[in-house]
Amino acid sequence: VKNQSHGYPIDPVPFTSVKVTDSFWGQRLNASREVTIPLAFSKCEETGRYTNFVNAAHPSDTIKVGGLAFDDTDVYKTIEGASYLLQTYPDKKLAKYIDSVLVIVAAAQEPDGYLYTSRTMNPKHPHEWAGSKRWEKVEELSHEFYNLGHMVEGAIAHYQATGKRNFLDIAIRYADCVCREIGTGEGQQIRVPGHQIAEMALAK
């Protein structure tokens, strides 16, 4: 009742306030720490997810944009999962690895905050789902808002688990870019996401 002033009577418990000690779930978390997260990061390396960010930091009209328009989110979600583990199993090596990945991600961000490698790595010939201009195909397949939603979720988890702002600041800059360019104001565009996820990020 006392929290009704927030608009909703129930507040979620921060995941950083929960420690799983049960043997069953403890085994699952340990498997995630030892197998799943390292495998997911290795797949990001092997399948060119990181290369996309490197290419976006050094765009060229000779780069062939392949894969899927939402490939960036594999990096964001893996960092999110790793962040959940860091609060239960502090790991300096893992934290350092995440920081190194975030250096690559930050380098791919455009000056105004826009971060969508499927366009930025080759603005003249972006991914076929991206459209010729920003947000042009948000309602279809570009996944620009979808990518942002996963980025925000990962950035919040990383900040809550580590207290570091390096990922959070990247996400805020992209969110600010969207707020400037999308809306009903003069010079803005009205766009509706074709795939939900940004809404989940807003809830957080």
Locate the predicted segments by residue.
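Glycan-recognition and catalytic cores of secretory/periplasmic carbohydrate-active enzymes
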Residues: 1-204
